[in-house]
Amino acid sequence: MTKLGYQPKILLPEGEFFRFEILSADIEDGEYGYQLGLELKTLGGKHTGHIFKDWSKISGDEDDGLFIKEGTKAEELVRAVLGEEADLEDLDTDALEGGRFMARVAVSQNGKRNRVDFGSIGRIPAEDPPF
């Protein structure tokens, strides 16, 4: 016989800013088309170590393949991690893994998961203490 424990769902508080590390980055093709899927871990504070998944829409077609459109959440995330001058023409998702950024957290419309709030994503200031 194997005993199982129980872990209640934990949601980060909506509207608060957190610092994140990207544990993994993958392109996923699902119900909402192609998306950049990021597994994120919170850094610092009482919620340190909390892990959740966030998705950002990416575009694709037969002629151009997959690409990040200007002005999207995916672009905002990549530039926060790799810098404003990052070359988005030939990006490998592996380059995002281990990257860090800060953003405001929101809760999905159905109240079941956290998400990173588009428009709030940025670089962690250089003067911030290490984690």
Feature-to-residue mapping (PLM):
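Short beta-rich binding modules
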Residues: M1-F131
